């Protein structure tokens, strides 16, 4: 830095005449030569400044020097080492100086340069020059330099005599002067204070030397300097480039243009610099001409280049300005303080401080410039050689006619005809003579005005490449040459700064970029560009971009302040930290001084594209009318979708819009003259860009922009692509830092570490605070971004879009209102923080519009708005903002190679959207156009060299180890590998979106509302892994249909609260990665949905409408290439699917606790596989309206509290879905594992079936409407079977030995025919035949017809259908089903109906009792009045007890007294049970909100609660389920096929009054010893659907069941009858039903039904007899009089045809099987009665004793063996029956004794179990009562049969007998021992007697009880030892 010369800050006034100081002539000549050498000696050839080489007329003041050669080495020393710029040659044709002798003080000093030529070269410096620690010369004050020069001249150039003579002459001249020329402190004046200090009578002070006087004289002369430079030419040669940049300046003039004027502020001086004819050309490079061979010069220095040689760029005016600034100084700044004057200065110090000291000293041998000095001296001593060199120079500089003319350059830049004028006005305040002003108040004021005309620039593609290459070289070399910075120097003395005001005015600035590569070959290119540069309005006939800037005004103001390094009153001490002092002083300066400021105003800025044929398209345009085009919506997001504005839109590429700039500006909204006139635009007038910044402080630059419109036409990018492709290879990132530079210690560039610096750094503020300094603040009212994409080519093979004028999709507008952008300064010194904010953008609202081609108005479909406060709240709206930060990314690469990761944080408080179908369609077209445009525009078939190397190691070539190693070696040199990462985080508080979906019937639009809260989007790129990750999370959402009545479709199940810590409703993660070695692109998509409810309402057409709404139009997205591998993962947790029936008020909800699905889709795959795993899947239902949902820990509890009842649950479900992507698209679903559980009551199951039926009706109303006509007559036999006629045959069939398998003589099948498909049978094959089947016996022998079996008709061609493609195949491999039937009722409506009916019956009974008491007699109608049946299942009324009168005769014929007693007993029981306490149901139980938290009576009926029982009464279990379901396409005759098999089927009895365990199970073995085959299926069903017509379908059913074993307890049987006969009352529909929905849909039609024989073995235990049913003629009720054990029957093979409905099918089977059993199998049934069964078994043994010897004799004649077999059978059967009978008698005796003990001992005995209970003794309800004694109560204890837990062997029987006997004997002994004590304790007369009486029966009965039990256990153990198979059956029978 140089101090401002004093002559620039002095007054302008008429200088007085020069004092007559007479200087000797020799001194004048020597002084002139000395001054020239002193100033120019280092920069030009030194010999040219000798006196004999200078043409001068000293008397006239004229000096001229020609042909000066600039010293390149000295100039290069001043170029910073990091700058790769070097001066190769420089010449000055003529240097002229004119001194105005003798009027030196009044006339100007003129200096002129003619033809200045500088050649610079931009090239990479050598490593030696990089490592050279070249430092720039230190700062020197110009005042000190001038003083030092004068001192050197006096003390070194002159001898003592000449010096004394000069000093005396100067002193004498000053004393004799009558006027003080320095009284007003004029330039060059002496700082002598007031005028009185120097007078003619007083000599000069002793401390005033003549050196100061001479320096003042020089300064006063230079104050009148006029400088002129003409014909300046600066050339820049770029290494490896063919063109040369040539800057030409016609003239530079510097002169004083001030007039003598004085005002109140002081006197001013005005100086001006005028620069004319500035131009920049690009000229072709030319070879250097051969130079003169001079051995000595060539060996000592590089050859001098000619004027046309290549050069490097630099600022050619820097040194000229420096030359002027060095000319004059303010002498007051060089005055020495008294302390400095008193101390003699060291001469050596003076020389070292002089900036020209090196020019006076001799060069050192060791320095590089030493040889140059020797060379120069050698040439100057040889005049002949010097003359030859000068002749050669003149010959090279002056062209001859024979020389080839220089190639003409192409003009690039021109400043026009106007000059660049710089005016500087300096004003210094007047100093009064009466007082001394302070040093700081006497500040000069400088005003600088720079005026520039029109600047025009035209860049061709080659020119752009040239400049980019130069910039790349500069950037790369500047980053490489990171030379350590010098240490902070000690602060210099305080110096005042001027008050400076600088203003720059630029009239216009035009930049035209020609992007057409063929323009450079045009013949008239030079003339065209010259014409345009001369007049910018002249068009350029080549396609180009034109940038225009009008009226730029820049102003800089500095108030002038002192910025000292430390306070003036403080002197640094050795122990004081300099940094600490600097910090204190700077803070003081900021507090007390006003900062400087910079202001820039731009009138207008625009960027246009000029195409051929007069086509003009805007690119950037400032349009003040944009913000008045529409009014911003003010409604907050929660107020709906109202408030979306509209604005006019137009395509700027239309032909009719190719006018001036006004054609693309927004016209004011038309109001017309009669409507009040147009909107005033005065507020919009002014600069489009206004910049203001306060310098010297931490304030940022504030940039205010008017409304800005940016037009983005993608076709423009395509037109620019050839230019960009030619430029892109030149743009490359910087190379890694060299190792020699990395080795430099980091502390070398910092200051020295001392204890003081450490303490100072500790007290310094943290570096993060410095890193947060704001750099710029940009504000704009509105920024509009308009994007259009040209229509794609009609043919995909075409690779050109054209001019891009055609438009297919539309235009997208993005309006950003109230934009505020703040950019931070992160390039501050000190330790940088780990993360620093770079920029922050904030805006009020952003609207995104879309307009199709045919639309003239655009409507916004997306608005980013602030989060406005709720009404009534006072709060500042939260504005949307975008923050940009950077931080170093974690990497294993070296520190020099780690790039920073950019973090973009977007906070969007609210988003509003209104999406219509035309908008979606247009956006899809737009996206497709952009995608196809990218494919066309950036399609490049040529592979890069690096890409070819990557392909060698890819999966296409095998990828060997060697290729991998080579790839790893080349990896660090790949520029793309070390890339900066990016993270984008978007936070959205609220989203309010409206979807307007057209209906399928074209009746209007369906409106959907989508709302979401707390939405977060995060995108992150990992450059090292070449991976991009995207995450999306939504905490709360609501998707509803608001077309009419709002219907919620999707949303969070329970309200979102901060305390519940719930997971997001939607979480999406998308990861895309590419393997660079294999070029495999992989996409991973993970979707997690949780805590949501998806509702399916009456209409599901909206699904098709949304699918049609989002469906891309035809021809869109057809050219997208899929990724190589796509992985999709879906996870559902705590999900609910609500199914709302179309016509009923209830609903079903499906709960999903955890579901996980995964699939992989490779590129080109023929099928896709989806694997799903589920756990905790459940189904709940509610009859009416549900209550509110509350937060709970368990999802099922949430719905149960709202009134839902649990119906089904899936514990585990694993499935695999495979779908073919080609051909017919076959779908295969494999369920590998499934566990189902159904829990229901009678009413909830009926409701579920009714709701499911309602769903079925709504899905297809015309299903099964058309049925085939069936001929039905009363005499038609629908049974394709024969009844038996030969009873002898039946007897023979029952006599078949059990050693032979039972065989069906008709089919030839036996039990061995039960094979599974895995054992060799083909799927769908059936083998028939069961023992005991009713058949017809033929009289004669059967003759088999050959080929008969092959010719049988096939009902189902399974094999052919199985091979047909295009079907949907569902296969269940392993599943289990458990159905739990509960007692009680789930719906409050059912319970209320029962309670109301009970009260009604009670009232009727009370009325009847009154009538009977009044003497009236009962009739037959009383029976109907005293009973009622609800829901076809529940009986309420008088008990049908076993008395003769009530049960057999009926109520109408019984005695009035008995009837009165029965009524009284019934009413007493009802009062006892209904008068219970009140209880509060659990929260949420009920049909609606009114049912929640209501008090109900603890209602009981017959001791049973009406609510669902805690435990199930009946459990139905199916395990080992395998199912195959095939659905065939419509063109097939077979529509579907279902094959169902179950390995096990059981019905468990959990009723507490029942002692039997399994109601139904498999038969272990029949009477003939046949057992079940291994792995045989217990249940097998096949259902085939046959398609007759398009809408007609019939079913074919075949079923086969293994032999069954039944243990039927009457309580369980009655429960099942009541449960499945329950018919819920029709639910009142809350919705109006259409006429066609009220009609019942026909049931299924079975074309063919085949049921194979079913063998049964029954144990039945009756408990009640329904005499009413007997009176009605139901003979089946007779079974309740007998116990059945082992009763066998066979339900014969039946084949039916033409059956409609399942109910009719069941009724038909019952009507067919029952008569058959009665007619043909009654004997087998009766033989199962308990007493008869024993006789039958014994009789069977007797028959074997007689018949087996006979049979054996007939067979082989060995009668002994037959007798042995018969005897064994007789003995075994007889012994077993005897033991069984004895055990029963012993058990019965035990029960009688226990009852007697209870009666006599005063204690209630144990329940009598194991015996047939007679008549029920319940208080209320009889026969068919749901809650009578037949079903257990929650309070009852579970009954255990005495036949349960039988001993397995004789040994265990004896042990059990001993244990029982000892227990009872001990009890009797304890009773006897306790009697005396009880007698002693009792007092009174009868107390002891009662104790003895009560103890005696116990003492007697206990041993008897133990004895009977011991006998029973022993006999049972013996029986089980003889018959182990019976023991296994008992385990299944008893609990």
From Swiss-Prot:
Skewed-composition ranges (Polar residues): 397-406
Subcellular location: Preautophagosomal structure membrane; Endoplasmic reticulum membrane
Cellular component, GO annotation: endoplasmic reticulum membrane; phagophore; phagophore assembly site membrane
Recorded catalytic activity of this chain's protein: a 1,2-diacyl-sn-glycero-3-phosphocholine(in) = a 1,2-diacyl-sn-glycero-3-phosphocholine(out); a 1,2-diacyl-sn-glycero-3-phospho-L-serine(in) = a 1,2-diacyl-sn-glycero-3-phospho-L-serine(out); a 1,2-diacyl-sn-glycero-3-phosphoethanolamine(in) = a 1,2-diacyl-sn-glycero-3-phosphoethanolamine(out)
Major localization class: membrane
Highest taxon listed in the record's lineage: Eukaryota
Membrane topology of this protein: Peripheral membrane protein
UniProt keyword terms in alphabetical order: Autophagy, Endoplasmic reticulum, Lipid transport, Membrane, Protein transport, Transport
Matches recorded under InterPro entries: ATG2
GO biological process: one example: glycophagy
GO molecular function, one term: phosphatidylinositol-3-phosphate binding
Function: Lipid transfer protein required for autophagosome completion and peroxisome degradation. Tethers the edge of the isolation membrane (IM) to the endoplasmic reticulum (ER) and mediates direct lipid transfer from ER to IM for IM expansion. ATG2 binds to the ER exit site (ERES), which is the membrane source for autophagosome formation, using basic residues in its N-terminal region (NR) and to the expanding edge of the IM through its C-terminal region. The latter binding is assisted by an ATG18-PtdIns3P interaction.
Protein family membership: Belongs to the ATG2 family.
Protein name (Swiss-Prot/TrEMBL): Autophagy-related protein 2
Species whose genome carries this gene: Cryptococcus neoformans var. neoformans serotype D (strain B-3501A)
Primary gene name: ATG2
